[in-house]
Structure formats: structure tokens, C-alpha cells
């Protein structure tokens, strides 16, 4: 079975538990931290999937590493470990955050700009484009890309809004050639 499908099922179960116990904000913060641990430490995942290390030692490692996280998340990680699915943690985190964002009416967006955007500029982008997407707000991550020359390129889901100078130059070039 596809990792994305499996991760979505676990994420949905964790989301339901978080909603019932009113731990949504806390679990979102914790799952982002867990995701970061797995993303930044390839050897950690290798250790958890190492066949010669006993399951009990792997469980102890999870309990020790994630002692500060709430029990629903820690128990989910232990369950994934027991079922040999610990490698889906990044996908599970992504799916969980997507579910939380959908429930809140928030969309994740990436803004590419020639210089870092101020909080006011991010807020203005969020206000304008959230309405276009039918959301209440956008959570914007800013990536500086000097090749854009100026302006902003905004990616929301699978949509790209290109208001960069380099994008405009490319469109003009296509019109002149074609």
C-alpha cells in the first residue's frame, strides 16, 4: 500500500484524537518538531529501522527522544514502530498539518521574492490570496530567490501566481518569439 495513503489514515486518527481531547494546537506544534527531528537526522531513522536493534531498544529510544511530546503522539510513534511503518513519519506530519489547516481554513503558501518579505508584506499577500483560495488566511514561508529580480512568485498548493519581473520578462519573450 502507498505510504501517502497509510500516512493519511494515521494522520486522520491522530487528528480525531487531538480534536476530541482539544489538543490540536499542541499536537500541531509537537508534530512539526518531530517532523524536523526526522528531516534533519537521517541516521535516527536508520537506527529505528536497523534490523539488529531490538524492538524494545527502539521503543526506549522513541520514549527517551520524544519524552516531552503528548501521549497521543508518542503512542502513535510507538505504534508505527511496532508495525514497521516508522518511515512514514514525515508523510504523517504533512498530512496531519494539512488536516489542521483545512479545519482552520488556512492554506500553506511559499512566497519567492528577490529580498526577504516583511511581516506586513506577508500579511498583505495573505489577505489578498486567501480570499482567492476560499481560505481565511495563508501561512506564508518566504524563500529569497535573487534570480526573480523583483516582485513575488507565490505558490499555494499546486497553483503558482507569478508577479516577478523575471516571470514578466519570460512572458514578453514568449510573445515576441511565438
UniProtKB/Swiss-Prot annotation:
This is ATP synthase subunit delta. GO terms for cellular component: plasma membrane; proton-transporting ATP synthase complex. Belongs to the ATPase delta chain family. F(1)F(0) ATP synthase produces ATP from ADP in the presence of a proton or sodium gradient. F-type ATPases consist of two structural domains, F(1) containing the extramembraneous catalytic core and F(0) containing the membrane proton channel, linked together by a central stalk and a peripheral stalk. During catalysis, ATP synthesis in the catalytic domain of F(1) is coupled via a rotary mechanism of the central stalk subunits to proton translocation. This protein is part of the stalk that links CF(0) to CF(1). It either transmits conformational changes from CF(0) to CF(1) or is implicated in proton conduction. The lineage of its organism: Bacteria, Bacillati, Bacillota, Bacilli, Bacillales. Pfam families: OSCP. Its main location: membrane. Keywords: ATP synthesis, Cell membrane, CF(1), Hydrogen ion transport, Ion transport, Membrane, Transport. The keyword Transmembrane helix does not apply. PANTHER family: ATP SYNTHASE DELTA CHAIN (PTHR11910). GO terms for molecular function: proton-transporting ATP synthase activity, rotational mechanism. It is found in: Cell membrane. It is a peripheral membrane protein. F-type ATPases have 2 components, F(1) - the catalytic core - and F(0) - the membrane proton channel. F(1) has five subunits: alpha(3), beta(3), gamma(1), delta(1), epsilon(1). F(0) has three main subunits: a(1), b(2) and c(10-14). The alpha and beta chains form an alternating ring which encloses part of the gamma chain. F(1) is attached to F(0) by a central stalk formed by the gamma and epsilon chains, while a peripheral stalk is formed by the delta and b chains.
